[in-house]
Amino acid sequence: RQRQMCIRDRLGREHFGKEVHVFSPAYTQEDFTQLLELCDHIVFNSFGQWKKYRQQVQDATRNISCGIRINPGYAEVETDLYNPCIPGSRMGVPLEQMEEDSFAGLDGIHFHTMCEQNSDVLERTLDHMLPQFDKWLKRCKWVNFGGGHHITRPDYDVERLVRCIERVRDTYGVQVYLEPGEAVALNAGYLVATVLDLSLIHISEPTRHS
């Protein structure tokens, strides 16, 4: 996955020429060295990773804005596989582990708690998260709402999304980012395939020797 990440980010830098943002649960030294040349924003999943690479970011020849992924402890995702806030989750830093010294040098906060959901879920997430992380949000330049926003779905409440963005932007004076990955290509085409062969194999019970 790390190798694919670097290829993707290089494509974003060289082909689109716009801002490149990256997040990973962890970075290897080899890949992080490449990311320093490719990315404008780097989000860390833990303070341990941030501390490991902080000096390299500060010594970089180009300006790189870094943030930390938080775990707000609130999500309405029904399938545990896609729920980053289930007990024992390692995705993001929970409130009780936020640290003054460790936060030094970070510009933003990232959270990703949604999966194919409408903006009412985002609104309730903010209701839960903003009061708890208010102290840290006041120190941020940007906030990333993560993905899972089904913006292009016919019943998606865009006006509510706008209110959510303006609420955070105006309260904390930050730039707001979203990552609606699936929504960009939702119902955008068809997958066409041809069946070339059918192979039906009946496997009998193995012979057991006593």
Provide a role label for each language-model segment.
Residues 1-4, 20, 42, 109, ...:
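Hydrophobic residues within beta-strands of alpha/beta enzymes
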Residues 68:
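Short conserved active-site loop signatures built around small residues
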